């Protein structure tokens, strides 16, 4: 498996590698512990904190990303602008902004909280399980993305109608429709009724 910022271990100050840890949470989103990232996703999965970002351009089009083929989880599928996991103790908002910049070279404008959603989505292709308490964020992409090729294979801005067409033909992440549907009220508020979200 290729090493990417999302799968790599971190080097500590003494030069030893540290596994990436995630926050485990209860059904209310209260932190109850930590787990190593891959272990948290192995069946049956452990409920952990995550985030999903939806960025739109000035025409109200959603920025999608196709996950890089080297990703250990859901490689090569389309998904929302950015998703990931805060480090233990890191605020979801800060993690969302950080990872959006790391993956896409974007600093979102007007990034706002859009609620939370809890789900359990097994990924048949990998055998991994997304047991997540997901913090949702919406905002604007006011500059062109500059994707990190180790994280993102491709990007596309799509209207609601174009998304429906693409979703019918191309593979998407198991969690995509769940997080999109949960974020729709905030998306409509951001983009206005004419955007069709």
Swiss-Prot record:
Coiled coil: none annotated. Residues 46-183 form the Nudix hydrolase domain. It is found in: Cytoplasm. One of its GO terms (molecular function) is isopentenyl-diphosphate delta-isomerase activity. Mg(2+) binds at residue 103. Its cofactor is Mg(2+); Mn(2+). Gene3D superfamilies: Nucleoside Triphosphate Pyrophosphohydrolase. This is Isopentenyl-diphosphate Delta-isomerase. It comes from Streptomyces griseus subsp. griseus (strain JCM 4626 / CBS 651.72 / NBRC 13350 / KCC S-0626 / ISP 5235). The lineage of its organism: Bacteria, Bacillati, Actinomycetota, Actinomycetes, Kitasatosporales.
């Amino acid at each position: 498996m290729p090493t990417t910022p999302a799968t790599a271990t971190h080097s500590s100050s003494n030069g030893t590698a540290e596994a990436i840890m995630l926050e485990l949470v209860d059904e209310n989103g209260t932190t109850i512990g930590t787990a190593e990232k891959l272990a948290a996703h192995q069946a049956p999965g452990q409920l952990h904190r995550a985030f999903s970002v939806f960025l739109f351009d000035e025409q109200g089009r959603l920025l999608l990303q196709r996950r890089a083929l080297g990703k250990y989880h859901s490689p090569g599928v389309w998904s929302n602008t950015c998703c990931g996991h805060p480090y233990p103790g890191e605020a979801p908002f800060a993690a969302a902004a950080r990872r959006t910049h790391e993956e896409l070279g974007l600093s979102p404008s007007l990034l706002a909280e859009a609620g939370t959603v809890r789900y359990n989505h097994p990924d048949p292709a990998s055998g991994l399980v997304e047991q997540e308490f997901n913090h949702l964020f919406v905002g604007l992409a006011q500059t062109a993305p500059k994707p990190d090729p180790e994280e993102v294979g491709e990007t596309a801005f799509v209207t609601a109608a174009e998304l429906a067409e693409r979703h019918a033909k191309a593979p998407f992440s198991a969690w995509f429709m769940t997080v999109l549907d949960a974020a729709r009220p905030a998306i409509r508020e951001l983009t206005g009724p004419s955007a069709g979200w």
